[in-house]
Regions:
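Extracellular glycan-modifying ectodomains
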Residues: 1-398, 407, 417-419, 424, ...
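Exposed aromatic-hydrophobic patches
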Residues: 410-412, 461-468
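Residues within well-ordered beta-strands of beta-sheet-rich folds
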Residues: 421-427, 464-466, 477-479, 491
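Acidic, Ser/Thr/Pro
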Residues: 429-431
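Solvent-exposed beta-strand/loop surfaces of large extracellular or lumenal domains
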Residues: 450-454
Length: 496
């Protein structure tokens, strides 16, 4: 039956609906023939995993499950809750505790966040750029009146601590958008909330209020007059068609369900900006000829929502990932202001850091750095890409690359929440250029990874790279053309 299901799915569904983007997962690759006893022992498990992923129709089955769970009033996914009014709430335990006040900043966490803000501010000031930090409140904060009493705030939240204590320690300008958006929620009407009922972001009216508040804050810091942006009663508010404007429909495989219709919110004559460029990891909004303030938003998913109204105040707004702040980015965008924009729940984890150039360490420098975690070097935990072949040997994991520079091997390392040193001990049979790539922040794949190239000589080589990302996602990709080496050790070291 399982064999027939795969064939039947291939015949019944159009190719577009079987594409990896529709299935929301990378296409599975069939495991190659093992070359060692450990590989043969792991083969049944790898075949079972590949076979289960090869069966199509996951989005239909998972979508049916979502509809059933919502109908029963049960959580459709982990940390996602539905209430009787049909609203969806994303409330991970760490974010809930930080917002409720039961998990406040301790001295160490406060120091980490203050240090990150201070580093960002100093980097910007060195380039003649003013720096600010903007906290976008969680939907659960702004619409707290719609939540159950047992989820109410008890003590000062991390957001409130951040606004006062962390900002003072870092000597940085911080804007908390919660008071303005809580006030805006008092103007809600049926079908016109400040945050999407079925998503996590602001509606167009919520974006307007956040943009006005941010523009007014920047003008006040500059000592400039209050910006003239559209008032609430001046907004152009045509109804938007029922769509997945900002819903969990995609993540829950429920396209066609979870539709929401809200009024738009735009200036009376329409927006004056144009989207000058949009590429992976960066968007550029330009008003008129681009003259006026330049603002760089190192922002999470709230950034583009905020940029639409900031671009009515500034001449140019560039939106980049929160972890992408670097000297190079400041030099290429040449902003007057750099704003870190993060959602409130991020305060429960790690601060956005400054992306510094990768530093190669000498082997003698590693003695003082304690080991934090090691990779398991066997074919069951590593993954070959392209024509690369991997095999377990007595001294480590053998990797033989093909002729493509994209051939490589993915080593599974535990995630890291702080900057770390990646250490690779290699025995090189065939030398060449090795590209080491890693993921930082929330990137789901290797499309926007960072990388660093090193030249491998024949014989023993130790590669030690200090990586500045605050959130290292673990997996490391080693790629190159025609390389042949043995990985004897792959580990994270603590940065002192």
């Amino acid at each position: 039956a399982a064999c027939c299901a795969v064939v039947g799915d291939a015949l019944a569904r159009p190719p577009a609906t079987r594409d990896w983007a529709a299935e929301k997962r990378a296409p599975p690759a069939a495991p190659g023939l093992p070359t060692s006893l450990a590989g043969w022992n792991a083969l049944p498990r790898r075949l079972e995993e590949w076979w289960s992923l090869a069966l199509g129709g996951r989005e239909f089955l998972l979508g049916a499950r979502t509809r059933a769970m919502l109908l029963l009033g049960a959580p459709p996914a982990r940390d996602l809750f539905a209430d009787e009014a049909g609203w969806l709430w994303y409330d991970p335990p760490a974010a809930f505790s930080a917002r409720r006040g039961t998990s406040p900043f301790d001295a160490a966490a406060m120091g980490r966040f203050a240090g990150a803000l201070r580093s960002s501010r100093e980097l910007c000031e060195a380039q003649g750029v003013r720096y600010g930090f903007v906290v976008c409140p969680d939907k659960e904060t702004v619409h707290a009146d719609k939540r159950a009493a047992e989820r109410a705030q008890l003590l000062p939240s991390r957001r409130e601590q951040f606004r006062s204590q962390v900002a003072r320690l870092a000597q940085a300008d911080v804007l908390d958008l919660a008071p303005a958006l809580v006030d805006e929620a008092r103007h809600d009407a049926p079908g016109d909330p400040t945050y999407f009922a079925l998503g996590t972001h602001w509606t167009p009216r919520g974006s307007w209020r956040a943009g006005v508040e941010c523009a007014s804050w920047l003008a006040a810091l500059e000592g400039a007059p209050e910006p003239r942006l559209a008032a609430r009663d001046e907004l152009w508010r045509p109804p938007l068609a029922p769509e997945h404007h900002d819903s969990w429909a995609g993540a829950l495989h429920a396209k066609g369900a979870l539709l929401e219709s809200v009024p738009d919110a735009a200036p009376p004559g329409g927006f004056a900006w144009r989207l000058a460029s949009s590429e992976p990891g960066q968007q550029r909004f330009v008003r008129g000829d681009g003259s006026g303030r330049r603002i760089l938003l190192c922002a999470d998913s709230f950034g583009p929502y905020l940029a639409t109204w900031l671009a009515e105040f500034a001449g140019e707004v560039v939106v980049a990932a929160p972890s992408s702040l670097s000297e190079e980015l400041l030099r290429t965008t040449r902003p007057d202001w750099c704003l870190h924009v993060v959602v409130e729940r991020q305060l429960a984890s790690a601060p956005p850091g400054v992306r510094r150039p990768v530093r190669e360490l000498r082997e003698s420098e590693l003695a003082a750095l304690p080991v934090a975690a090691r990779a398991v070097l066997d074919p069951a935990h590593a993954r070959a890409r392209g024509a690369t072949r991997i095999a377990l040997e007595s001294s480590g994991l053998r990797a033989r690359h093909g002729d493509s520079p994209l051939d490589g091997v993915v080593l599974a390392l535990p995630p890291r929440s702080t900057a770390s040193v990646l250490v690779l001990e290699l025995l090189v049979e065939r030398p060449g250029a090795l590209r080491v790539a890693w993921r930082g922040g929330a990137d789901p794949d290797f499309l926007r990874l960072r990388s660093h190239e090193v030249q491998l000589p024949a014989g023993r080589a130790v590669v030690a790279l200090e990586l500045s990302e605050q959130d290292l996602q673990g997996s490391v990709l080693l790629s190159g053309r025609g390389l042949d080496y043995l990985v004897g050790r792959a580990e994270w070291r603590e940065v002192r």
